[in-house]
Amino acid sequence: MKRNVLFLILFGTVYLLNAQVSMITSQFSQNLTKSDLPFSGDRKLYAIGIDDKNTENYFVVSKNRSGADNDELFIEKFSKEGKQFVKSFQYKLTHPINKSLAFVDNRASYSDVDKDGNYESLSIIDQHTSGPESKIEKVIGMIMYQNKAYEVWVSADDNFSQNFYSDNFSQLPTPISKHFIDFWNRLNKP
């Protein structure tokens, strides 16, 4: 009996270790500043260390200054090359009214769907009509695959019922698009 329990524990541990495609680390991401990593925005909203099988990475979301004429949201990935981190991905959204774009960190997905050792992700952004207290006009899902951005979104125009896709979305491999669209379709949207 003891042997069976030990075997199950060992098997479960090995299975979980092999299933782990990335390790999310906080390291210095909580106190990350522009002097640590040159992110594009004036203020950091969110940062997390994500180490996949091939590289150490930091995923940073930042925005332009509060009170600016428009709203700019940046999603960037910094990957370790040698002894330093370099920007390996950047995605930028703009809106004519400040504080109208909101990154939703608790609905993101990080995975290595194609098992190439590099993580893919889905980030969710709520786009409000005129600031954070106004109604949501669009929900955007930005898929990062091989350091390129692909978008899926729903709009208030049709009561958030139909998915729309960026022009390059069809270039995503089917397993990647299926994985993230399945996740996307399970999310509650306004």
Task: Enumerate the language-model features and the residues they cover.
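A short, structured loop/turn motif at beta-sheet edges
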Residues: 109-119, 144-149
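Short consensus segments that form the blades of beta-propeller domains
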Residues: 60-69, 97-100, 129-136, 140-141
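Surface-exposed loop and turn segments in beta-propeller and other repeat-based domains
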Residues: 86-101, 158-172
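Bacterial Sec-dependent N-terminal signal peptides
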Residues: 1-27
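Acidic, small-residue rich beta-repeat scaffolds with periodic aromatic anchors
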Residues: 19-47, 137-140, 144-190
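Beta-propeller blade termini
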Residues: 41-56, 104-113
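Acidic/hydrophobic-patterned starts of short beta strands in beta-sheet-rich repeat architectures
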Residues: 53-62, 115-125
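Surface-exposed turn/loop modules enriched in turn-prone residues
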Residues: 66-94
